[in-house]
Amino acid sequence: MERRVEVGELLPGEGALSVAADIYLPLRMRSPPTALFCLPGGALTRGYYDLQPDPAPEPARSAADFSFARSLAARGFIVVTLDPLGVGGSSRPRDGFELTPDVLTKANAAAVDSICSDLRAGGVAGGGPPLEELRTIGVGHSMGAMLTAMHQARECRHAGLMLFGYSTRGLAPALSPEEAAFSDDPAGTRQNVVRLARARSREPYPEINSSQGRGLFAGKGADRRGVEALQSARAELLITAGLFSMIPGSSAPECVRLDIPIFLAVGDQDIAGPPHEIPASFPAAPDVTLLVLPATGHCHFLFASRRHLFARASDWLETVVT
């Protein structure tokens, strides 16, 4: 079920902006009803959460093979996938350099609040039952995990977070000397990130070429069918937010404040740094679960370990929301 959610006038001269979403409703709703709000990583659309090989697999139930959304919906959870502003079906401002993480977070928060209100009132599925006891979980991959953490630190909406392929380490080797000078200086990064993004790229929505993308997103051991399905979920990069996520420590203050259970999943061939160092970034969280996926790169859903990930995610959710 596709939705477009108005999120208001967030940038001068752009008018009202909207966020695109897909809502996957379970055939049998678990109790209490729980919605997962999922944000994709950089250079990906919300389609990352519902990868479908071409031609369509048979039998129909195997359509969930690479699909986080369908797998978790089959386990009784509502899954909502969102395109950040500038990506996929969401509004694309003319000056994409102004899409800072703070602007994106405001838009995401507005979209989540709107959809939650509809779910609680029973207005999503054409007269479905009101879900007054709805619980929510924030889910994000890579840059989307950063935005999910920032949303929770700002709004405190969710009962827990699931963060995939994410740490506060950034990608220091990919930075220029001027960009690297802001490492572990989140205030300075915020003040300068738009200027740095304009210096780094002439385009606010640059494309990642196919060979570079395959190396970053897939890598050794990725299932060919998943790699091919991922092509339909590829998008241009949001350069400002992408650069922000690459600068070490940029989102550390938000992570320090998170005081809810957190599920971390990283591949042993991921780009998030040493996995067992990541939980230390969440000192206020009462429970931090770390799952290290074997023989797995950055886009976890492309690898054989995805089935274990989907099952562990479901088990963790049961402990958090019951």
Task: For every predicted segment, state its role.
Residues S176-Q269:
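Alpha/beta-hydrolase
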